[in-house]
Amino acid sequence: MKVSAALLWLLLIAAAFSPQGLAGPASVPTTCCFNLANRKIPLQRLESYRRITSGKCPQKAVIFKTKLAKDICADPKKKWVQDSMKYLDQKSPTPKP
């Protein structure tokens, strides 16, 4: 029994000091979009947005947050998405990255 406990303890220590364990904030999961909205979202429903440009995601996207706290993924190449981002930038006092 002591051998099993010692082996378990050793495995836990090894996992804690592995490169993935030491990675810190970089190992935080990234939000990715797999389905993009096809229809324009009414501007009155939008509250904010963020861009998804991580190399870990299969595609670049914009995630709009609605006033009802829903996240909606959209294609940043679409004109309505660019217009919506511009609208939110003008509405917001702080610029988006």
Swiss-Prot record:
Q: What GO cellular component term, any one, is given?
A: extracellular space
Q: Which cysteines are joined by disulfide bonds?
A: 32-57, 33-73
Regarding how it is modified after translation, the entry says: O-linked glycan consists of a Gal-GalNAc disaccharide which is modified with up to 2 sialic acid residues.
Q: What InterPro entries is this protein classified in?
A: Chemokine_b/g/d, Chemokine_CC_CS, Chemokine_IL8-like_dom, Interleukin_8-like_sf
Q: Which residues are glycosylated?
A: 94
Record's note on what induces expression = Induced by TNF, IL1A/interleukin-1 alpha and IFNG/IFN-gamma.
Q: Name one GO molecular function term.
A: chemokine activity
Q: Where does the signal sequence lie?
A: 1-23
Primary location: secreted
Pfam families, per database record: IL8
PROSITE patterns in UniProt: SMALL_CYTOKINES_CC
Q: Which SMART domains match?
A: SCY
Name its cellular compartments.
Answer: Secreted
Q: Which UniProt keywords apply?
A: Chemotaxis, Cytokine, Disulfide bond, Glycoprotein, Inflammatory response, Secreted, Signal
Q: Name one GO biological process term.
A: negative regulation of neurogenesis
Q: What does this protein do?
A: In response to the presence of allergens, this protein directly promotes the accumulation of eosinophils, a prominent feature of allergic inflammatory reactions. Binds to CCR3.
> What family name appears in the similarity comment?
Belongs to the intercrine beta (chemokine CC) family.
Q: What is this protein called?
A: Eotaxin
